[in-house]
Regions:
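Basic, Lys/Arg-enriched alpha-helical interface segments
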Residues: 1-66, 75-79, 86-125
Length: 125
């Protein structure tokens, strides 16, 4: 098929917490169900609902208070989730996602340096 499977993962901060999961856990059952469907669409490569702002994607769910999922695409095969919100807090949610995205990119650089030296050990684990 033309749509490729994309890996969708939550961004984990250095303390291991997931801003996306914290937001998701605050949703009621119906909203959580809508968000779960949206996430599975992303996994199928369906990004037609995503609007982009400076590298941050906003997946809009046309339901209830207008839920949004904030994400970034890292290459073709990976989408990173930074959190979500409603239309009401859109601007602050976008700003927060941008900060997390910068942090993600910075840490990814550091990790790839470490991995270069760590590759031999990893195979034996």
């Amino acid at each position: 098929s033309s749509m490729s499977i994309i890996k969708v993962q939550e961004y984990l901060k250095e303390d291991g917490s997931s801003p996306y999961q914290e937001w998701f856990n605050s949703l009621d059952v119906q909203a959580a169900a809508k968000v779960t469907v949206a996430k599975s669409r992303l996994e199928l490569g369906n990004t037609s609902n995503v609007k982009w702002f400076d590298g941050i994607g906003e997946y809009k769910i046309d339901w209830g208070p207008g839920y949004r999922i904030y994400l970034a695409q890292d290459g073709k095969q990976l989408i990173v989730l930074f959190g979500g919100g409603t239309k009401k807090n859109q601007q602050s949610d976008i700003n927060r996602a941008k900060e997390l995205y910068q942090e993600y990119k910075r840490r990814k650089k550091e990790i790839s340096k470490e991995q270069a030296t760590d590759n031999d050990n990893r195979d034996k684990r």
